[in-house]
Amino acid sequence: MSFWPQSRKARRRLTILLAIAPVLALAVGLALYGLRDSISLFYTPAQAQEAKVSAGRKVQLGGLVQHGSVVKYPDGNVEFVIADQKATAKVVYHGDLPDLFREGQGIVAEGSFNPAGVFEAKLVLAKHDERYMPREVSKALKEQGEWRGEGADAPAYGSQKP
């Protein structure tokens, strides 16, 4: 009994399939390899500690800016602490913070942890009106019992009706 089909039509189909499959697999592999730097997972400080996020890996870190933690330096660096109910994470950011950034508000910072465990943010996103809370942040805060009700009735970004 042979693997190769007996009919000419079936052999042609199998030959085409065997020729296309590796090319398709290579194309998918190259696409995923190219996208690896643009993919960033969302974590709260507690989830990042539990997952033991490796240093240098691009992630999004979200939570509430802890009261009294914001320190602005003359060189443009800003340090603050993002907190959830279970853990905190120190964040360092160089640049101008969004106008709506303030203590006690939900934010999402995109960047990576350094070997010392400090989150080096490349981008800081703050909520953009008094009722909006980023979907990932509000979901994580609700799961941890930290949800304070602000923006509880607000629609998530992208689901607002005009």
From Swiss-Prot:
Residue numbers on the Periplasmic membrane side: 35-162
Annotated heme binding sites: H128, Y132
Segments in the Cytoplasmic topological domain: 1-13
Principal location class: membrane
Pfam family, one: CcmE
Cellular compartment(s): Cell inner membrane
Residue stretches of biased makeup (Basic and acidic residues): 140-151
Example GO biological process: cytochrome complex assembly
Gene3D superfamilies given in the database record: Nucleic acid-binding proteins
Keyword terms, alphabetized: Cell inner membrane, Cell membrane, Cytochrome c-type biogenesis, Heme, Iron, Membrane, Metal-binding, Signal-anchor, Transmembrane, Transmembrane helix
Membrane-spanning residues: 14-34
GO cellular component: plasma membrane
Bilayer topology: Single-pass type II membrane protein
Keyword Ribosomal protein included in the entry's annotation: no
MF terms (GO), sorted A to Z: heme binding; metal ion binding
Domain of life: Bacteria
Region (Disordered): 140-162
NCBIfam families from the UniProt entry: PRK13254.1-1, PRK13254.1-5
The family this protein is said to belong to: Belongs to the CcmE/CycJ family.
Role this protein plays: Heme chaperone required for the biogenesis of c-type cytochromes. Transiently binds heme delivered by CcmC and transfers the heme to apo-cytochromes in a process facilitated by CcmF and CcmH.
Name the UniProt record assigns to this protein: Cytochrome c-type biogenesis protein CcmE
Lineage: Bacteria, Pseudomonadati, Pseudomonadota, Alphaproteobacteria, Caulobacterales
